[in-house]
Every structure is written in structure tokens, then in C-alpha cells.
């Protein structure tokens, strides 16, 4: 927010696969971008497999009620991209309280991803911290063509627990919709809607007073056989070793979902990073190289 006016930051990204100039047998991905304040794209990096890593910077330092963010990503055929954030996103206590909005206005983010055939996109923002009284909602829509792969991992902290802060009347809402174009038309792969608030945070059948929630989703490029899925889930459960929190995972018709509830953002990120590496192996891709912007990485 600037002055009394809320932000509406917009970021549009296009990923394009091209042949490497120094090796005609290799492909790399380049990008085109257009952003409005407070969004800014920092310098892109290339992974060993030619994947384009794009760090997205939110220069305002946080969100308050009424602020809006819009992210649109188009991944061209056979492109490979990883979009992350430069720092944790903060959602401050809400403003704009009125008779119509007694708890204040919501900060919001809309993300739309379009993946062409054989595209591979990883959406891996850093932690989101909802301050006391903060209101945040997001909607993510993913459109996949055949053999496209989409992977997302998000970690949310409800309240600044280190400062003894609770969520109070704050809340976090999320809607994720993934559909794929098939020979018989558009098929839904996942529709996932969540809301976390103080009641859910305190309820033993909800968050059980644990302040951190994480969600990992992978829409695979091809259906996984029963044997491959069984092995993947078994390995993901083994990967929970020596990490704090409650962790569970399950298969989709064509992919995987994993959830984390616990005290540690670092534990959530470490588990998801291990699963991320498993999915790279199944896609016959290089071992993930965590973006340099991420803190607290495993050795």
C-alpha cells in the first residue's frame, strides 16, 4: 500500500525453449517479463538442465488489506522454469474496517499458469507469514496441455509465534484448480480449497495449535503406474525422518499431494525439497538446485 491507496501489482512471465548457442543438442529456457510495482524480476539463473530460475521481488515489503497481486505465467512448449520469491511475504494486520467489512479488507493474490505441451514449471515461493489480524486470500488456476508438469510448494506461518503473537481474527484462504487438456476434453486433476483461521489453529482436529502449514502438489506429465506410485509414496514417507511435525502424502490420478502441519517452516521446506528431488528423478531431470535466495538449506 502507498499512502491510502492499495497496491495492485502485476507480473506477466513468458518462458520460451530454445537451442543453446554453444551446443546444438542442448535446450535452454529464456524468459520475457513485464511487471508493475511493487513487483520486480531479479536476474534469472540457469540450472544445469537449462531450466530458467526466476526470483520475484515484492519491493513493498509486505501486504495490507486491499492490496492485490496478479501473476500470470505462460510456459511455452518444452520450456522449463522455476519461479520463486526473493524473501518471505508478510501479511500485516488488516486495515479498512467498516460496517461492511468489520474485520477489515483482504489482501489477495491471483495466479494463472498456462503450460504448453511438455512444459515443466515449478512454483516455489518462500514462506508466507500472516501477522495478527492479517487477512489473505489467494487463487491459483493451472491449465495444462498434454505431458506438461506443474509442481507447487507453499509454506504458511500463522502469527509471529517467536514474538508470542497469535492470529486473532486473521485468516488465510487458498483455492487451487488444476485442469488438463486431453483427447476427450478438459479434465480436472485437482480442486483444493482451504481456510485457516484462529478456530482451525486451536482445534485439535485442525492445526492442533501448530503455527505452520505446508502444501506440496505435483501434477505429473504422465500417469504413474501403481508400482511407481507406491514406491514414490513410500520414499516420501521415509523422507520425513528427523523432521518435526505431522506429515502426510497421497497420490492423485496423475501426481502427488503432501501436507505439513507443525512448528517449523524449515522442517516443512526440507521435507518438500526431498519430495521435489524424488519428482525430478521420475522426470529424468537433474537434481534440484535450491535457489540462492533460499535460507537454511540442507547440506
From Swiss-Prot:
This is Urease accessory protein UreD. The gene is ureD. It is found in: Cytoplasm. It comes from Prochlorococcus marinus (strain MIT 9303). Its main location: cytoplasm. InterPro entries: UreD. Disulfide bonds: none annotated. Belongs to the UreD family. GO terms for cellular component: cytoplasm. The keyword rRNA-binding does not apply. Coiled coil: none annotated. Keywords: Chaperone, Cytoplasm, Nickel insertion. GO terms for molecular function: nickel cation binding. Pfam families: UreD (PF01774). Required for maturation of urease via the functional incorporation of the urease nickel metallocenter. The keyword Chaperone applies. UreD, UreF and UreG form a complex that acts as a GTP-hydrolysis-dependent molecular chaperone, activating the urease apoprotein by helping to assemble the nickel containing metallocenter of UreC. The UreE protein probably delivers the nickel.
Amino acid at each position: 500500500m502507498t499512502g491510502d491507496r492499495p497496491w495492485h501489482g502485476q507480473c506477466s512471465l513468458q518462458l520460451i525453449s530454445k537451442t543453446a548457442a554453444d551446443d546444438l543438442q542442448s535446450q535452454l529456457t529464456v524468459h520475457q517479463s513485464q511487471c508493475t510495482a511493487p513487483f520486480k524480476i531479479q536476474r534469472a539463473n540457469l540450472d544445469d538442465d537449462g531450466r530458467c530460475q526466476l526470483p520475484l521481488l515484492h519491493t513493498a515489503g509486505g501486504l495490507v488489506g486491499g492490496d492485490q497481486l496478479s501473476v500470470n505465467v505462460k510456459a511455452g512448449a518444452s520450456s522449463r522454469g522455476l519461479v520463486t520469491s526473493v524473501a518471505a511475504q508478510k501479511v500485516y494486520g488488516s486495515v479498512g474496517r467498516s460496517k461492511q467489512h468489520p474485520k477489515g479488507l483482504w489482501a489477495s493474490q491471483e495466479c494463472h499458469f498456462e503450460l504448453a505441451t511438455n512444459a515443466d514449471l515449478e512454483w516455489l515461493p518462500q514462506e508466507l507469514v500472516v501477522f495478527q489480524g492479517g487477512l489473505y486470500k489467494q487463487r491459483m488456476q493451472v491449465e495444462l496441455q498434454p505431458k506438461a508438469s506443474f509442481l507447487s510448494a507453499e509454506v504458511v506461518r500463522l502469527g509471529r509465534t517467536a514474538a508470542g503473537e497469535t492470529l486473532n481474527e486473521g485468516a488465510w484462504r487458498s483455492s487451487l484448480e488444476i485442469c488438463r487438456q486431453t483427447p476427450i476434453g478438459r479434465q480436472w486433476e485437482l480442486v483444493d480449497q482451504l481456510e485457516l483461521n484462529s478456530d482451525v489453529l486451536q482445534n485439535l482436529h485442525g492445526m492442533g495449535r501448530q503455527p505452520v502449514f505446508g502444501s506440496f502438489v505435483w501434477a505429473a506429465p504422465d500417469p504413474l503406474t501403481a508400482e511407481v506410485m507406491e514406491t514414490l509414496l513410500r520414499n516420501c514417507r521415509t523422507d520425513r525422518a528427523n523432521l518435526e511435525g505431522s506429515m502426510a502424502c497421497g497420490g492423485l490420478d496423475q501426481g502427488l499431494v503432501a501436507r505439513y502441519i507443525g512448528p517449523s517452516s524449515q522442517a516443512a521446506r526440507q521435507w518438500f525439497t526431498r519430495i521435489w528431488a524424488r519428482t525430478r528423478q521420475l522426470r529424468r531431470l537433474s537434481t534440484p538446485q535450491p535457489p540462492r535466495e533460499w535460507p537454511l538449506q540442507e547440506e
